[in-house]
Amino acid sequence: MTALREGTKAPDFALPAVSNSPAVSKSKEDGGKFSLKDALQHGQVLAIFFKVSCPVCQYSFPFFERLHKAYGSQKVAIVGVSQDDKKNTAAFLKEYGVTFPALLDDPAGYAASNAYGLTNVPSWFLIGQDGEIKISSVGWVRADVEDLNRMLSDANHTALRRLFHPGDDVRDSRPG
């Protein structure tokens, strides 16, 4: 099985969050979960699947945080989907300065990860409001992240934001 590709309908998921955020329901009925279906009513969703022990996840998350600061909460909800427990995920978010919401994919079955056909992390998917995957990427691929930056800029009708800075160790690719 391989990760879902562009043009595929994104499987729905509702996952608990590490902490409350505007993108996460505080409803008692759903247990305070983030619902992909509900989020898509407000805009696109960038779902980034990760493990805290993954060196490529550690490398890439500061760049995803830059995307969040540039475009998040406008017409795109950016969420991490952790394959770890709440305590370790919270420590990861703090260590890497991540401010976007992180969700927990139950390690007992990894239902969301399996639905998306994950073979490696990080794997990420930009999901359009129509529920279709617009971009998917496995590992770190600089060209994919640059394409994502352009798409988010276009979707938000804003100038393209600088994602990479002088002195950044930006590799063309790193397998997950």
Protein language model features and the residues they cover:
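Structural microenvironment flanking redox-active thiols in thiol-disulfide oxidoreductases
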Residues: 58-96, 109-112
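Thiol-/selenol-based redox modules, centered on thioredoxin-like
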Residues: 129-176
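A short beta-strand-turn-helix
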Residues: 13-45
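Short, internal strand/loop/helix patches
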Residues: 95-125
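Short active-site neighborhood of thiol/selenol oxidoreductases, capturing the structured segment around
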Residues: 35-58, 64
